[in-house]
């Protein structure tokens, strides 16, 4: 058996991998208006200019932690696809129980 894992059951040698865009500086995709809308939802009236970069940094750390845990659950289950339940369990592990996504 060639070392193609669980998914490689077809014939041939496995084609070329698709090109994947290099991800960099995507945190800037969290725009100033988006942060402002989140703050408004939280009841904030005025926002300091320094808040935007700080918010991006905090959000990045939070998402890195949640995604790391979710991927750990996925790998333990020997899957390659992260499911909604993986994310729910990852959030629960961090003390942020999320309802409405199964389980």
Swiss-Prot record:
Q: Which residues carry this modification: N6-acetyl-N6-methyllysine?
A: 6, 13
The PTM N6-succinyllysine maps to: 13, 32, 78, 80, 92
User: Residue positions of the PTM N6-propionyllysine?
Assistant: 9, 17, 32, 45, 78, 80, 92
Query: How the protein is affected by changing residue 41 to H?
Result: Found in a patient with a neurodevelopmental disorder; uncertain significance; results in early developmental defects when expressed in zebrafish embryos
Q: Where is this cross-link: Glycyl lysine isopeptide (Lys-Gly) (interchain with G-Cter in SUMO2)?
A: 13, 21, 32, 60, 80, 92
Q: Which disease is it linked to?
A: Tessadori-Bicknell-Van Haaften neurodevelopmental syndrome 1: An autosomal dominant disorder with onset in infancy, characterized by poor overall growth, microcephaly, hypotonia, profound global developmental delay, impaired intellectual development, poor or absent speech, and characteristic dysmorphic facial features, including hypertelorism and abnormal nose. Other variable neurologic and systemic features may also occur. Tessadori-Bicknell-Van Haaften neurodevelopmental syndrome 2: An autosomal dominant disorder characterized by poor overall growth, microcephaly, hypotonia, profound global developmental delay, impaired intellectual development, absent speech, and characteristic dysmorphic facial features, including hypertelorism, abnormal nose, and wide mouth.
This chain's protein is named: Histone H4
